[in-house]
């Protein structure tokens, strides 16, 4: 019985130490989440303004494209025009490691479902992985990666992802693939995220009718077409970067939730072990008393 008591005490002490670690990790993830949410909100202000300018610039082209009535005097930007799809590009965003609950598995499972349902052969798509978990997952299944990016910081700057988002945009312009999607978990709140597959190229999220609702008037120098040639790739890059920031926020939320769950589970285990310890201790005391009483009776 004594050995059992010591074993339970050791397990209680070990679980308490683990609980302290998971609680600290929960607090760190909560801090990262707060910073990521603030960064995401700031970026959204910038993204909305860029979108407003791009919508204003592309209103005429978008209306012509929508009505299937192109004009000979306008050089339509290739990033706005859908073309026959021979190959599809995917950017898949995961975490670099674990301790984030089902965050990674959710993204990878649903991405694989898309690949299996929409494509007959790996030759039909191009994969780009952001995050070590996703990169290792695809390599283990023999899926070639056009590019991979690991060890992204907790609050990624545009400079960190400039190469990969610029490369993805250039690959589309060079017709390496004919459409580009980003697969990631969208942050809703600290407890909830939602898997998303968003089409980034060709650019399809602009509504020409919105151009009439803007109060600003713009004077362009040089021409609209020349400005769009520079601005549209930057806009596409900002869309991809926005998805990366959103995914990173969801990752921190998943990490915080996973560590909170681990801490709560540790507390439950400690409570159960404490009850077991008290019962074992009570049993040991009862047995000792019984033995003393029996010994005293034998002496009488």
UniProtKB/Swiss-Prot annotation:
Its assembly, as annotated, is:
F-type ATPases have 2 components, CF(1) - the catalytic core - and CF(0) - the membrane proton channel. CF(1) has five subunits: alpha(3), beta(3), gamma(1), delta(1), epsilon(1). CF(0) has three main subunits: a, b and c.
InterPro entries tied to this protein: ATP_synth_F1_ATPase_gsu, ATP_synth_F1_gsu, ATP_synth_F1_gsu_CS
List, alphabetically, the PROSITE patterns matched: ATPASE_GAMMA
Signal peptide segment: none
Provide the function of this protein.
Produces ATP from ADP in the presence of a proton gradient across the membrane. The gamma chain is believed to be important in regulating ATPase activity and the flow of protons through the CF(0) complex.
- What organism is the protein native to? Enterococcus hirae (strain ATCC 9790 / DSM 20160 / JCM 8729 / LMG 6399 / NBRC 3181 / NCIMB 6459 / NCDO 1258 / NCTC 12367 / WDCM 00089 / R)
Q: Family assignment?
A: Belongs to the ATPase gamma chain family.
Protein name, per record: ATP synthase gamma chain
Gene Ontology cellular-component terms listed: plasma membrane; proton-transporting ATP synthase complex
Any one biological process term the GO annotation gives: proton motive force-driven plasma membrane ATP synthesis
The record, for Gene3D superfamilies, names: 3.40.1380.10, ATP synthase, gamma subunit, helix hairpin domain
How does the record say this protein sits in the membrane?
Peripheral membrane protein
**Swiss-Prot/TrEMBL keywords:** ATP synthesis, Cell membrane, CF(1), Hydrogen ion transport, Ion transport, Membrane, Transport
Q: Where in the cell is it found?
A: Cell membrane
Single GO MF descriptor: proton-transporting ATP synthase activity, rotational mechanism
